[in-house]
Amino acid sequence: MSVVGFDFGNENCLVAVARQRGIDVVLNDESNRETPAIVCFGDKQRFIGTAGAASTMMNPKNSISQIKRLIGRQFSDPELQRDIKSLPFSVTEGPDGYPLIHANYLGEIRAFTPTQVMGMMLSNLKGIAEKNLNTAVVDCCIGIPVYFTDLQRRAVLDAATIAGLHPLHLIHETTATALAYGIYKTDLPENDQLNVAFIDIGHASMQVCIAGFKKGQLKILSHAFDRSLGGRDFDEVLFNHFAAKFKDEYKIDVSQNAKASLRLRATCEKLKKVLSANPMAPLNIECLMAEKDVRGVIKREEFEEISIPILERVKRPLEKALSDAGLTVEDVHMVEVVGSGSRVPAMIKILTEFFGKEPRRTMNASECVSRGCALQCAILSPTFKVREFQVHESFPFSISLAWKGAATDAQNGGTENQQSTIVFPKGNPIPSVKALTFYRSGTFSIDVQYSDVNDLQAPPKISTYTIGPFQSSKGERAKLKVKVRLNLHGIVSVESATLLEEEEVEVSVTKDQSEETAKMDTDKASAEAAPASGDSDVNMQDAKDTSDATGTDNGVPESAEKPVQMETDSKAEAPKKKVKKTNVPLSELVYGALKTVEVEKAVEKEFEMALQDRVMEETKDRKNAVESYVYDMRNKLSDKYQEYITDSEREAFLANLQEVEDWLYEDGEDETKGVYVAKLEELKKVGDPVEVRYKESLERGSVIDQLGYCINSYREAAVSNDPKFDHIELAEKQKVLNECVEAEAWLREKQQQQDTLPKYATPALLSADVKSKAEALDKFCRPIMTKPKPAAKAEAPQAKGGEQADEGKSEPEQPASAEAMETENPAEGST
């Protein structure tokens, strides 16, 4: 089972994996930890990640970036409209009111949903993890911003499905940071709570989280955020400053040119980093636009002055986080700052003034989220044993249910009024389940919605659930228990609806028990009837309280000690009440979410595009192989291969290589994989024999020496007078001598043939044949010359009467064999 954490950032992504020795942030194919979150569509294939970033300057209109700003949001969203203005690619409104991204792919304009593009990026990250783990990756944990709505969270899950992933948890990025911070702390207090503020200033947003730590656990006390306050906003301030300056000085409008805008934004990002450590930063760009070189300079004070509108917004999420947590500045013990946008000195100055203490940077600002995601995945995985550490997460929004109800049936002349109740208040633990009781006579609907939309740029209504049809056996208003779940991903859904009906069953009880039971049933029935008589028809409670306790099916609690019932004549048949539970059909409508069929189609399209990418990569590899072979062989023919090919063959081969090189850059520039494979095989038919002759000349001497050593060794052993060979019969030794003579004669004959041949001729003596001859000689001679000495026969002791003692027959053999072992292996005996 894979344990992988993905930090899907607005600008860059990171992949962390859990191994037995800890958490590692793995490298991509370019040996970088950070992978750009860019998908570039080309005429023949897609370029994703680092390859996509490299293609952006040449193909800006088809390079899709900042996908997190688009996913799960309506096209009419004001924030989305502001973001679109700075994006070089085309985004339009789809038929469902959500954005569609347009790009030129395989020679035609195609439309993609943001979910599809995110799935492409996740598929690339999955490949990075699989390459490092050498195993398939399915289970994972993905970090998401705390401000993601229900629809955005569902969109991330759909994107993961498209990529072939199964997220065990969509964890808030600030929670992942807190987990990565706290799980390794060994000095956390056992009783008192250590309050730490985590401030994540990313590429496009600012998130604040206040967490309380105790030994072995963390509790999220509050979340706050600003969706549009990040590092890119400072880049945009610099971009607008220099764009206006260049418009006055050089009479060029950079904002009207996509490539020029990309180059200036990239330069402004570097400028921001320079200003974080220096009081002044110069800017120089050659041929920015209209063949004009531009230059400029900016001081840190000037940069901070033009950034005042952004800096003024920093305190709002800080104040809200403290307010929601019910803490003061003095209650916060430490402040941790992470994120790529946290390096602006003015930001740190504001944080220091607000908290009254210097923010700390004890964590890796870029990697902490991915590490926290991998740790959470390891905690959820059964294959990893992780230090005991509990994470108590809280939900950043308030969720309510709305329905038409509490009125009598239509025949009674009643009217239905819209009612609602908050089921999951802000700060509710994740996950959580609540149960509600409804009294209905027919099918009805429940709306899941946000209670407070002030912090949201999203429609209040999340989904609608239709419950029914159902039929009450008594023809009265039925009692239904509806279970609502806030799952681990922060997604709210109506999980089930159950029809509860009371039935009377006859059971044998004594007279005294019958009277007592009747009294209890009457009390219970009156209690059950109470909710129906009120104005409200809903009772909300934790789901764990809704299940009947053991032994209460008949409405009577089961006693701990059951007295033995004696059979008497006073037994009677008395009615008992039992609750019958029936599941009621439930249908779901999530506003803006992809349907199951649409997700399946997206999975198929992703498979087709991935196959096209793989074919093109293999084609490029084969083309590069042909090109590499041409250059390599041409150099070797003029150097070390020169003596191993005739002059006429070399000239013809060189001409053929030149012809193939010209073909590669002309007619063969855009061919299929099979054509390149055939072209390489054609060249190798001429080049391989030359290469073989060269390698044979290098290897032949060493293998001949090995065979000669083998012949001499066995021949000397066969004619030796050494006592250790005395037990070998002369006939056997003669066989060894004959084999040695035969091998030596074969080698002499082949060497004479080889010496008469020029280097460019086909070798008569191959190194492989010499190796085979040496192996055959060794295989024949070794068993003979290493035959062990026979065991010495010791005299058996004579028993009384001249008979040998039976028990002593096998005893002398052991020391004899041990002696033989010591003789043949003196090294072993000395250890």
Curated annotation (Swiss-Prot):
GO cellular component: cytosol; mitochondrion; nucleus; plant-type cell wall; plasma membrane; plasmodesma
Superkingdom of the source species: Eukaryota
Localization terms from the record: Cytoplasm; Nucleus
Assigned keywords, A-Z: ATP-binding, Chaperone, Cytoplasm, Nucleotide-binding, Nucleus, Phosphoprotein, Stress response
GO terms under biological process: protein folding
Molecular function per GO: adenyl-nucleotide exchange factor activity; ATP binding; ATP-dependent protein folding chaperone
InterPro entries per the UniProt record, alphabetical: ATPase_NBD (IPR043129), HSP70_C_sf (IPR029048), HSP70_peptide-bd_sf (IPR029047), Hsp_70_fam (IPR013126)
Region (Disordered) residue spans: 502-579, 784-831
Residues annotated with Phosphoserine modification: S533, S536
Biased composition (Low complexity): 787-800
Disulphide linkage map: none
Disruption phenotype: Knockout mutation impairs stomatal closure and accelerates wilting, enhances sensitivity to heat treatment, and strengthens tolerance to potyvirus TuMV infection.
Pfam families according to UniProt: HSP70
CDD domains assigned: ASKHA_NBD_HSP70_AtHsp70-14-like
Comp. bias (Basic and acidic residues): 512-526
Homology family: Belongs to the heat shock protein 70 (TC 1.A.33) family. HSP110/SSE subfamily.
Job description of the protein: In cooperation with other chaperones, Hsp70s are key components that facilitate folding of de novo synthesized proteins, assist translocation of precursor proteins into organelles, and are responsible for degradation of damaged protein under stress conditions.
Protein name: Heat shock 70 kDa protein 15
Organism in which the protein naturally occurs: Arabidopsis thaliana (Mouse-ear cress)
